[in-house]
């Protein structure tokens, strides 16, 4: 057997570094502390709690043996049984009414969402069409200007060309002026 003195000699356990006690003053600090603790050991799996299932009443009993009424004899234990069954049934009906109301509200919300989406798409299409029209107008004016420069030719005097181009650009400027200004 080994001597008791030899078995009690162990290397000392590594000591944990002391952690400072930090009391979070607000939700942001609390979140920061939780993140720091998670990031100390990134290999460790993070426990993600599952969504709690919504409360639902027990389904009604498939078979009720003794159907008793509220007029059970005074002092009998039957009244309590009736009362509990009635309470559960009312609870179940209230739950079904609440779920029907919730489904109705969800359906209305989805309809409103779809309606808003369609309206937004129509507005976007209208604006896109307007932008495209303005762009085409600018391109057309640019082409007209280039054609006029080509038609003038190098042989004509610059004074006449500049006056005719000034007249042409004046009409073009009137055409180019948009009915609205963007970004104001």
UniProtKB/Swiss-Prot annotation:
The protein's name in its UniProt record: PRKR-interacting protein 1
A molecular-function term among this protein's GO annotations: double-stranded RNA binding
Keywords from the UniProt entry: Coiled coil, mRNA processing, mRNA splicing, Nucleus, Spliceosome
UniProt GO BP: mRNA processing; renal system process; RNA splicing
Matches recorded under Pfam families: DUF1168
Family as reported in the entry's similarity comment: Belongs to the PRKRIP1 family.
Region called Interaction with EIF2AK2, residue ranges: 1-50
Coiled coil residues, start to end: 91-152
Listed GO CC annotations: extracellular exosome; nucleolus; nucleoplasm; spliceosomal complex
Basic residues bias (residue ranges): 126-143
Biological source species: Homo sapiens
Region described as Disordered: spans on this chain: 1-20, 37-76, 120-184
UniProt keyword annotation of Coiled coil present: yes
Primary location group: nucleus
Residue numbers spanned by region Required for RNA-binding: 51-143
């Amino acid at each position: 057997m080994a001597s008791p003195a030899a078995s009690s000699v162990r290397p000392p356990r590594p000591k944990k570094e002391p952690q400072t006690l930090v009391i979070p003053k607000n939700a942001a600090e609390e979140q920061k502390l939780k993140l720091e603790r998670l990031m100390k050991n990134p290999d460790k799996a993070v426990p993600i709690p599952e969504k709690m299932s919504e409360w639902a009443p027990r389904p009604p009993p498939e078979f009720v043996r003794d159907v008793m009424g509220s007029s059970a004899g005074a002092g009998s234990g039957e009244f309590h049984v009736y009362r509990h069954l009635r309470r559960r049934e009312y609870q179940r009906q209230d739950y079904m009414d609440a779920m029907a109301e919730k489904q109705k509200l969800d359906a209305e919300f989805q309809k409103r969402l779809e309606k808003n989406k369609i309206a937004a798409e129509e507005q976007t299409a209208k604006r896109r069409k307007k932008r495209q029209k303005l762009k085409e107008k600018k391109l057309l004016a640019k082409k007209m200007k280039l054609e006029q420069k080509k038609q003038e030719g190098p042989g004509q005097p610059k004074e006449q060309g500049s006056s005719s181009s000034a007249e042409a650009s004046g009409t073009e400027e009137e055409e180019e002026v948009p009915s609205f200004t963007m970004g104001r």
